[in-house]
Amino acid sequence: MNQLFTKTLMSAAIACSLCNTANAQLSSNPDKFLGNITTSWNNDMDTDGFIFSDYWNQVTPENATKWGSVEGTRGKYNWGGADKAFNYAKEHGFLFKFHTFAWGSQFPNWLRNLTPEERYEAIVEWMDAAKEHFPELPIIDVVNEAVSGHQNDTPLIKEALGGDGKTGYDWIIKAFEMAHERWPDAILIYNDFNTFQWNTDEFIDLVKTIRDAGAPIDAYGCQSHDMLSYDGKNVAPTFKSSMDKMHQELMMPMYSTEYDVGTEDDELQLKAYKEQIPYMWEADYCAGITLWGWIYGSTWTTDGNSGLIKNKVERPALTWLREYMQTDAAKNAKSPFPGMVKEASVYVKPAAIGVESGKVLPITVNASLKTKTIDHIDLFVNDELIGTLTNAPYEAEYTPTAEGKYDIKAIVTATDGTQFERLSGFKVYPARTPYNGEKEIPGIIEAEDFDGGAELFSFHDSDNKNEGDIKDYRKDAGGVDFVKGNGGCAIGYTATGEWLEYTINVKGAGIYSYEATVSCGSGDGSAFSIDVIKDDDLVNLCKVNVTQTDNNQWSTYKVMSGEFKVPLEAGKQIIRITIDKPYVNLDKIELKLEGTGIQSVKGDGLSDDQPLYNLYGMKVDKNFKGIIIKNGQKELNK
């Protein structure tokens, strides 16, 4: 199989122990769990005389491990509810899941008052506190609901962890790296909703991108709240096709993390359970199912109607679920994590997920085994063996010669013959091409003339459609939006996280000032950052806060000015403009070498009939090298 898996089970003693503790529960499968959540804010495990451990063999606190619940006051941690669930799981011998670390909702209110740097420190402190309190965690929802549009406050977390970056999801990768550093043996999950309907493709793109970039993600979590049709009258029509698509695209372990069917109609709920639970449970890449509540009236859905016990009576779906879990198909269903634990941590990390044709791409395989020993790793690119790696660090190089998508596969072989697989990938692009030539600095950068290349290579847009009113300016710009503005062409319909890169040639090193010609009709204003790329890292030059230029109109352009906080070096380099706050139209940015007033650089093209002067007011000819004054403006003639 093309997924992370092990061909051998845990020791008989561990497996037997799990079976013995699960005898009273609905599932007796030793390799995948059927779990549930704590009920209500009081974290009840047993409700109305019904005992949690009689039904379920995994627990997720509904709220007790969310940041806002734990650290309402900075530096003061309330672990009471989390401890109750953790100790209950430990007492009964089943799994406890930590939910969740990075989420654009239910974080402490005091986080809003911090700078991005201070927010980052707060996140580090939060994760360190969790590590100190729970030194060992078996399974974690690391990042929750980060698909674009799912949580309005996601940018608060995103900005603190480094933003979109080169992959579009650098901040998520950072969160997973932080979790893996603290809990290397934990199963690390990305969790989101609307994965079976409405946002399947967006979910796949996010998970696949961070996987390909080498994030230590072990599984994807489908919340599974979207199990009925939009009108709530039928079972979700795209459930099976979406589940198949996610597996085919990702080839990773999957969890159903928050399954519920919210309806008062017993027959509709039963129908959904019958169609959906076996399809997930019997998939050998599905590692477990967690139901999101079980007592009617005590779940998050309308009137708590997803509950399975109503008026102290089991609803038909629960009666059926009990019967199904006793079938051979349910008992013997395979899992990507035998024994419900992670044996292998294998993550393939190419130096970049986008590379120019003909350039060397370093590839690293970060691999470790919990109880076994690695013998060797076979590394493939598009099914071609490029190396057999026997010693850590496990590194190789590959030079692509053609454009397109490339698949990477690492097969880790242990000394006992057990094998584990991990996929990754990268794209090969044509060489970066400065559009309308390199931008000489001091000088003007027209926003629409960003470098040619490809999406996530020389630019990034949140969709693949040009929604502007200029359709024919460029054909190599993906979904970047070109609009009429300020008498010419501008970039419009900007969204947070989008970016554009420009190749510049700096003629004079030093601190530069900027004059950005922009428009913004939003009363909240907008913002963007300018960074220079050094050794594949972004070095911030400035953040431009854009005030409203006209009320709900984007036709009025004004100049926002300021100064870079670090100097530019002389020579060729790449700068990036990143949208930090949406709804700004970008026309152009003029860069001047501070302290000189130089507004542009001229290499040739000066004519004899142009009056030219040096800084002392003396007339010079076109052959003079240095700072000249032409038409009242300073230029550097080289």
Per-region residue spans from a language model:
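Boundary/entry segment of secreted carbohydrate-active catalytic domains
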Residues: Q25-Q58, E62
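Acidic-and-aromatic substrate-binding clefts and catalytic sites of carbohydrate-active enzymes
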Residues: N36-T47, W67-G80, F107, V147-Q151, ...
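Short, acidic/polar
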Residues: S40-S53, E121-A130, N199-I210, A272-I277
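Substrate-binding cleft and catalytic face of glycoside hydrolase catalytic domains
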Residues: D54-G72, G80-T195, T263-D265
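Aromatic-rich peripheral "rim/lid" segments of glycoside hydrolase catalytic domains that contact
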Residues: E71, A129, D141, E145-G165, ...
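Extracytoplasmic
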Residues: G339-T390, E397, T401-E594
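C-terminal outer-membrane/trafficking sorting elements
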Residues: D375-N382, G595-K638
